[in-house]
């Protein structure tokens, strides 16, 4: 297992996200409740969890019907590895974007099947996990891009599915991320490079009829890309409807 990871591992197939404490407090409740409502067990990995995070995690666990588990790691990015001094904002942002892939092998070896998602995703309707060992979201590169950015935008990193017998793929993704550089799109670069070597008949390809950032009715997962997570009326309304945490406090302590 990865050095420094602690907490409770899942023991059943899960939807999985990873985040820091700020994003947990902002997005974890709607993510968990939306998964609960379609019967999917949940695992969340938290970097540098605060006491408020652990308090909220306990209440969310008590207020849901599905199994919800949490692991965590503690890290000072200013002194991580060979780095010394204030970490660049882009490198810090990239680390958190890559976080779920850094611990993916640990999680899938315990859970058997893992769908890794962004923490700001909402699960909008029931769905089955694929029958292949791997699932990912290929896409056309963004127009007018070249080099690193063009290569990175060939894959949407907001969804990635893996089964335990393909855990070496998770290891390869984590190892590629470890090579850096910690610039934006690193997670997508790692996915693109590793998945390129997997036979197509072993891979499920997702598209925007499954994971959707335009928030259309009938799609399975809504993902709050960029500012849309704050200013898109349709997404914000759905997020608020899923977020039953405030009433959970009353239910759990009454």
Indicate where each model-derived feature is located:
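Catalytic core and acceptor-binding pocket of nucleotide-sugar-dependent glycosyltransferases
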Residues: 166-254
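Conserved catalytic core of nucleotide-sugar-dependent glycosyltransferases
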Residues: 124-189
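A short, charged, and often flexible helix/loop element on the N-terminal side
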Residues: 75-98
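GT-A fold catalytic core of metal-dependent nucleotide-sugar glycosyltransferases
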Residues: 92, 96-143
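Short, polar loop motifs at secondary-structure junctions
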Residues: 49-53, 119-127, 209-211
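N-terminal anchoring/stem segment of glycosyltransferases
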Residues: 1-82, 109-110, 164, 168, ...
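Conserved hydrophobic/aromatic beta-strand scaffold that supports enzyme active sites
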Residues: 103, 159-161, 221
